[in-house]
């Protein structure tokens, strides 16, 4: 009788309110409004897909409305420069020498606004992703620790935050200034075709690409290795703890071990909910800037094709290299988004056996 009463009393003490699937308010405040609303509902997957598709088409429509006017002006400038170059050729070599220079100055002037606004947009998006990383990763680490992944939570959070901050610093302090240097060299090389500055701009573009690819590869390898090593340590620690509790605590040891399994299951649900909300928030935060940068890159490629048809080689090279600048910023923004998504997916996949 005493054992039964003791068992019932112990079970009553273990009956406590559990809110393991409630997403922290700080994370909801950091997410876009649409993602925060979906995060509190049950159909986050279906609603998230619909929201992403709708946001994509809205961003595409808005980007075309903003960029088509500038692309048409660039195409008209290129065609007028080609016509003026053909007319100046009949007047002599001295007259035809300055026509491409005027065209380069016009294209550079027309592109200055796009370059400033879109590179600024990419920079702001990367900063928003960095801020979201500083809030989202500690939240995921706390949920991961609740799953029993104490070693994983500490190592993963500190290491991933450090790696993400290093990548953001590399982009802001080194790669973006190099992109501006690439643009300046491309413009100077188009104005002075025989100087070889355009080749230097191409070399600088390759250097930026190599640095970005190297940083992304290092971050990806870190996520892979840290997930494997720390996850193995956590699984061994949790199994040892369950065995110790089951054998050391009299009467209710096995019950406590089973309740630990239930707590871990609830923590897994929390981590999955936070991960889904975080993935949706990251995608919504970077979708519109990526679409706009991609549209701008394609329009500059189209303008370069028009320039090739018109026969003005310096303008063709300049427009191609300006398109490359948009592609570089697009790659940097996409790298930040993809690596944050990879960190979230690695965390979600760290299941304690």
Model-predicted segments: where are they?
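Alpha-helical transmembrane segments of polytopic integral membrane proteins
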Residues: 77-81, 112-119, 139, 143, ...
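Gly/Ser-rich, low-complexity
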Residues: 1-100, 113-133, 148-161, 165, ...
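Hydrophobic transmembrane alpha-helical segments of multi-pass transport and channel proteins
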Residues: 174, 211, 215, 270, ...
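Helical hairpin unit composed of two closely spaced alpha helices linked by a short loop
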Residues: 272-313
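Loop-centered beta-sheet repeat module
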Residues: 160-221
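Extended, low-complexity, charged alpha-helical tracts
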Residues: 132-136, 143, 305-309, 313
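Interfacial loop-to-transmembrane junctions
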Residues: 204, 310-331
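Mid-bilayer segments of alpha-helical transmembrane spans in multi-pass integral membrane proteins
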Residues: 105-114, 133-151, 170-183, 187
